[in-house]
């Protein structure tokens, strides 16, 4: 039915409208494309395997060594913080005028501690003058 309508109105169509859009298939070009596709797939697989090996043999040991180093550094920090807990206020350096200025109390807690106050690290030092 379509062909009948197309032939009837063929005079109003452009001259190439009823011809096939593509010529006959090129078997050699198709084979080259298939080989290129297979080579790309093999390259992708090899590259993926290479990055897996790099991740396992380079990245994981580097992370492990960094973790060991971090453990010892943080262990020293913990010992230092434990020591600072027992230091009396009189041995701490004096606060400067610009430190711990409160123009009005904070609306949380006791009004004197900042939002990110950490009682292990932060402390108010009271000196007798």
UniProtKB/Swiss-Prot annotation:
InterPro entries: Cyt_c_oxidase_su6a, Cyt_c_oxidase_su6a_CS, Cyt_c_oxidase_su6a_sf. Residues 1-9 form a transit peptide. Coiled coil: none annotated. The keyword Membrane applies. The chain crosses the membrane at residues 44-71. It is found in: Mitochondrion inner membrane. Residues 72-129 are mitochondrial intermembrane. It comes from the Eukaryota. Belongs to the cytochrome c oxidase subunit 6A family. Component of the cytochrome c oxidase (complex IV, CIV), a multisubunit enzyme composed of 12 subunits. The complex is composed of a catalytic core of 3 subunits COX1, COX2 and COX3, encoded in the mitochondrial DNA, and 9 supernumerary subunits COX4, COX5A (or COX5B), COX6, COX7, COX8, COX9, COX12, COX13 and COX26, which are encoded in the nuclear genome. Component of the cytochrome c oxidase, the last enzyme in the mitochondrial electron transport chain which drives oxidative phosphorylation. The respiratory chain contains 3 multisubunit complexes succinate dehydrogenase (complex II, CII), ubiquinol-cytochrome c oxidoreductase (cytochrome b-c1 complex, complex III, CIII) and cytochrome c oxidase (complex IV, CIV), that cooperate to transfer electrons derived from NADH and succinate to molecular oxygen, creating an electrochemical gradient over the inner membrane that drives transmembrane transport and the ATP synthase. This is Cytochrome c oxidase subunit 13, mitochondrial. It comes from Saccharomyces cerevisiae (strain ATCC 204508 / S288c). The lineage of its organism: Eukaryota, Fungi, Dikarya, Ascomycota, Saccharomycotina.
């Amino acid at each position: 039915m379509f062909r009948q309508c197309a032939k009837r109105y063929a005079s109003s169509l452009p001259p190439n409208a009823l011809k096939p859009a593509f010529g006959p298939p090129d078997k050699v070009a198709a084979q080259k494309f298939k080989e290129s596709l297979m080579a790309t797939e093999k390259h992708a697989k090899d590259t993926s395997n290479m990055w897996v090996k790099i991740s396992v043999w380079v990245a994981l040991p580097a992370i492990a060594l960094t973790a060991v180093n971090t453990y010892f550094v943080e262990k020293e920090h913990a010992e230092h913080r434990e020591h600072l807990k027992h230091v009396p206020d009189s041995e701490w350096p004096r606060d400067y005028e610009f430190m711990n200025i409160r123009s009005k109390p904070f609306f949380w807690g006791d009004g004197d501690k900042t939002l990110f106050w950490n009682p292990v690290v932060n402390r108010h030092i009271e000196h007798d003058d």
